[in-house]
Amino acid sequence: MAGSVMVPSVSIGLALSVLIFFALSLKTLEARGTFGRLAGQPPQRTAAGGICASSVHIFGYKCEEHDVVTQDGYILNMQRIPEGRAGAVAGDGGKRQPVLIQHGILVDGMSWLLNPADQNLPLILADQGFDVWMGNTRGTRFSRRHKYLNPSQRAFWNWTWDELVSYDLPAMFDHIHGLTGQKIHYLGHSLGTLIGFASFSEKGLVDQVRSAAMLSPVAYLSHMTTVIGDIAAKTFLAEATSILGWPEFNPKSGLVGDFIKAICLKAGIDCYDLVSVITGKNCCLNASTIDLFLANEPQSTSTKNMIHLAQTVRDKELRKYNYGSSDRNIKHYGQAIPPAYNISAIPHELPLFFSYGGLDSLADVKDVEFLLDQFKYHDIDKMNVQFVKDYAHADFIMGVTAKDVVYNQVATFFKRQA
């Protein structure tokens, strides 16, 4: 029920029952790989030595590794590509405008760099005259550091995307703005759009943002059609894993990975192609890119973050994390129901670009259309909307046609906001 503050005990019971079933089912899955074709194969190009070294320098681009400390102590890794391969000056002959590119859920900045150089968004924008920055949110492989906590401690994972809104994005924006002295173009994909919408709605970063491009925009998830995600959300799987003491949600190893396999078996889903199962039928991926993606992703997040996303699916609203009871919510928020994020409060003069796909199982067309309706009072000359009929969720980050279909339009949009 929308606005509910209680986690029904019957639902927790269902989740625990599901987990018990999963545990009993694991022996039947031992011979199958969680992530399809990579099972048993050696990894290809990985970012073990850092994203710059593994995936930017090899293409002939300059790249800098930066560390940023959030107000709550997390040390986030960022990459900066300060210029294009040819070292050309900015398009207007002046200073290069900074662009922050923010990845989605269960991946990191490497997800933007899986194709040949001329198909990778960060490198395309650098060649177009922008100062490109890539963020890596807390919990991903190069942002698993903290001033006094470590990933083996439960407290390290005590966060949701609320903290990405309150701490991670502001730290990245402040760092970029402090070094460049310029307003920042923001580009998000999937969860990267959600935390952008939430942050801009609370007006925290609007003085530093020049424009925003949202690919596969996610805010409302009630029509999500990815079967594996829907099952996980509606059976309270994340809540149950939290109860059983697994604060880190790591799809690639341990029990979480086993549970994903068990969901596939129970629901009759062919998870050999897990990318399509989760994201929709992508039109424009090639096999080598998918293999490289699966060699590097998915990345960890917190189980609490997955609970928050599951709440968004079930409650059909965009609210802060629900602590499960009126008393606990009052303790955290001063009210029984978690505060809502009011997307319509995003400043109407902020230039926005949306691109969404007709086959996306996560950013479903109905949910995106409902999201766009929240901008009905936005300045009409500041709204730019692109619908790509045959695109699904992953096409926007590694589709072989994305440069011509989406990225060139993004670059043109950013240049118009100079």
Curated annotation (Swiss-Prot):
One of its GO terms (cellular component) is extracellular region. It catalyses: a triacylglycerol + H2O = a diacylglycerol + a fatty acid + H(+). Keywords: Glycoprotein, Hydrolase, Lipid degradation, Lipid metabolism, Secreted, Signal. This is Triacylglycerol lipase 2. The lineage of its organism: Eukaryota, Viridiplantae, Streptophyta, Embryophyta, Tracheophyta. Transmembrane segments: none annotated. GO terms for molecular function: lipase activity; triacylglycerol lipase activity. Glycans are attached at residues 158, 286, 342. It comes from Arabidopsis thaliana. It is found in: Secreted. The keyword Hydrolase applies. One of its GO terms (biological process) is lipid catabolic process. Its EC number is 3.1.1.3. The active site is at residues 190, 360, 393. Residues 1-31 form the signal peptide. It is an enzyme of class 3 (hydrolase). The gene is LIP2. Its main location: secreted. Belongs to the AB hydrolase superfamily. Lipase family.
